[in-house]
Amino acid sequence: MKTLRNQNYWWKFEQLPLLLYLCKWLFLSVLSGACIGSASALLLVSLEWATQYREHHLWIIALLPVAGLLIGLMYHYWAGTASRGNNYLIEEIRSPHDIIPFRMAPLVYIGTVLTHLFGGSAGREGTGVQMGGAIADQFSRLFRMRRRDHRLMVAIGISAGFASVFGTPLAGAVFGLEVIVVGRMRYEAILPSFLSAAVASMVCHAWGVEHTHYVVSEVPFPDASNLLWTIGTGILFGLAAMLFSRSISFWSGMAKRISYPPFRSLIGGLVIAAAVWMMGTTKYIGLGVPTIVASFTEQQMWYDFLLKILFTTFTIGVGFKGGEVTPLFFVGATLGSALSAVVPLPMGLLAGIGFVAVFAGATNTPIACTLMGIELFGAEPGLYLGIACVVAYLFSGHTGIYTAQLIGSPKHLAYSRRKGKTLAE
């Protein structure tokens, strides 16, 4: 009897702090998730309008240099630390110093809408993540949180922003845990990340926003031959991810030769507008969602992925705003579709594998990308997706679109000396 009473006493003593912890983060996750989900809904609706307006008024692409100058001026004179984008969020989670300035959210929103409206090639994930991180961290200031909780709030923002932009709460939650350190997960944020991702995704949907649906119609039995082909294509997807990441660094370095930052996007806008005019197509600017969808049923040209890499990395490198992930989907899906001409796997499956594998290689988040594939395409191709994501992650090397990522576990023993360094070092 005495033992039973002691057990009841210890249950109350040990579980009460956990209950309080759950209530605290449930409140903060619902609050921040609702705000971020609403912000993401506004972003997605705005980008849909910008895309439709541009496609019906193609003359507006000629004004891309003007938009570039406006974006450059905004960021040069008002952004401050917010100009570092996603890398700033990663740095603050790893080594917290300051509250993320709220101005990051409206600046990246305006910059992204202008980029898409006037014909830049960019995505939306980076915008959603930055808006999410900036919005969530304002509650750190409001409630006077400790440094540890400040880190968790930024992680909440990343997860909620990602989940609501793509409608993938599981992938969004894990992405916020996996993206900070290469090869390691940050489990201290697991509860608030999952809660905020779920709430943000639901709120975004409640605003009437519909996400794109993709269909992998045929999934063969995973025999040895099919899995070997998956590994082979995973290598190619990893190399494509490496090319994408290094191209952004290259164009960014080239742009820095122009001493006055606003002129970088001005001149870059001139180049992009001229290239679109000479090619006579808008296929490689904007999000490219129609081409991504078509890749699952129609074989794409072998050079489509290369041109999207060129247009997107140049757009981001010279200072336009937006994410890189949707263009990465384009790169992977079109490359997978083109490979169906020589690889004996269904076109839709190859497009789906490429969709998530290039993303995994460029962001160093193979688990989140595998979950995203399962959320988007269903569980049936899960084994193929997982293998390709891991292989692409390995073969992309220590590169990535987030250069502030810390190498926590090197991808190969030969690179053990890089442990503890960032991708930029």
Describe the residue ranges of each PLM region:
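Alpha-helical transmembrane segments and immediately membrane-proximal extracytoplasmic
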Residues: 1-425
